Design a protein with these regions (language model features):
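SF2 helicase catalytic motif II
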Residues: 1-45, 302
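Helicase motor interdomain insertion/brace
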Residues: 12, 16, 42-43, 52-66, ...
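Short glycine-/polar-rich loops that comprise or flank the Walker A/P-loop
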Residues: 24-28, 50-53, 72-74, 246-247, ...
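Conserved segment of the helicase C-terminal RecA-like domain
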Residues: 28, 36, 317-348
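Non-catalytic, charged low-complexity extensions flanking SF2 helicase motor domains
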Residues: 81, 331-373
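Conserved helicase ATPase core of P-loop NTP-dependent helicases/translocases
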Residues: 223-227, 233-287
Length: 373
């Protein structure tokens, strides 16, 4: 079983493994994954579902692997937001902090530091109480979540993506948005976003990306994947890279969501074939390209933003250095969640390897023991 980390819930592997174990005379299962996850219970869950007994781990530095892997150059490039974008950030941070303070005064939260998952869980708990104060708190939490998303787009993505989001917000009919639209900080944030978008000012990452790709395309055989989290960002990346001499970018995204655009599996397959044949030399890709793709060779992988997930970090980086040396370039915005996400994924990957080594060194059944059972 390849990509064994997918073995959760009702994934087909579970049924196949169970049927095989029931019918095979001498069953023996090998499960492979580059990214099993960092938590022991998750790894054990995969083991149980695939009837796996022993765990083995190999990294690029292990002596029996080293002769067969190619060198990967890792570059981490940090950019700084310009003054106008920092001003915009200040407006958004002021809104978020004022709402967080309200929630603390209401006794709904006890700390200034709450993440999106905690806020969503809190909304669920408040909804169960069905009280006036609870409904008000839920609405304020909605404001925090919306503003934090806007902040994330400003810090890590593009002005274009932020403008698309604020335009969408303005069409929402909710109490949370109605209150935001009366806030001077929000009014100023929208004004500045519109001004920056109108004058063509973009996130410094985009300029740095154009610089990087221009340099990499000096290699006429270059094959490059640029990963980004959001489709609006991918569209802007495609637009910017299309201006580079010798660049032949293409958007590679998942299937359509509601009214949004998307690619069918047939279209995805066609784009990959054309990428391999050289019709395109840059994939501007979403998460759909992170695993399971039969890409012949990619010289360079660019993370437009770091991912906090160790699994996704490994999958993205795994798109290069398959048959020859490769390069992984990670773009980060200074003093933003980009840096936090980068170190989070690094820490999780380190923890994952440690967990696997501990599981490997624990009591395991040998092949001889297995046959004698």
């Amino acid at each position: 079983f390849d990509e064994a980390h997918r073995c959760v819930g009702d994934y087909a592997y579970v049924f196949v493994a169970k049927t095989y174990m029931q019918q095979a005379k001498d069953p023996l299962i090998l499960a492979l994954t580059a990214s099993p996850g960092g938590q022991k219970y998750k790894i054990n869950d995969v083991k149980d579902k695939l009837f796996v007994t022993n765990v083995e781990i190999r990294t690029r530095d292990d002596s029996d692997v080293k002769p067969y892997v190619h060198e990967v150059e890792n570059d981490f490039i940090t950019v700084e937001l310009p003054i106008a974008m920092k001003s915009l950030m200040t407006y958004l941070v002021n809104i978020k902090n004022s709402r967080i303070s309200k929630l603390m005064r209401m006794g709904v939260i006890r700390s200034n530091y709450v993440n999106k998952t905690q806020l969503l869980n809190l909304q669920v708990e408040l909804a169960k109480k069905k009280q006036g104060v609870s409904y008000m708190a839920m609405s304020i939490i909605a404001e925090v979540i919306k503003i934090d998303h806007a902040l994330m787009l400003l810090e890590t993505q593009t002005i274009h993506a932020l403008k698309q989001y604020t335009d969408k917000l303005s069409k929402e009919e909710s109490r949370a948005v109605a209150r935001l639209e009366k806030d001077d900080n929000f009014i100023n944030a929208i004004r500045l976003t519109n001004e920056l978008d109108a004058e063509g000012t973009e996130h410094p990452k985009l300029e740095k990306l154009v610089e990087i790709i221009t340099k990499e395309l000096q290699n006429k055989d270059a094959r490059i994947i640029v990963f980004a989290q959001y489709r609006d960002t991918i569209s802007k990346i495609y637009e910017a890279l299309s201006e580079i001499k010798g660049a032949a970018p293409v958007e590679f995204i998942g299937q359509a969501k509601k009214k949004g655009k998307g690619l069918s599996q047939k279209e995805q397959s066609q784009i990959l074939n054309e990428f391999q044949m050289g019709f395109y030399n840059i994939l501007c890709a979403s998460q759909v390209a992170e695993e399971g793709l039969d890409v012949v060779e990619t010289n360079v992988v660019v993370f437009y933003e770091p991912t906090p997930s160790a699994v996704r970090k490994i999958q993205r980086a795994g798109r290069t250095a398959r048959t020859q040396a490769g390069k992984v370039i990670v773009l980060m915005t200074k003093d933003t969640r980009d840096e936090a996400y980068h170190w989070s994924a690094h820490r999780k990957e380190k923890q994952m390897n440690q967990t696997l080594r501990e599981m490997k060194e624990g009591k395991q059944i040998t092949l001889k023991d297995f046959k004698n059972k």
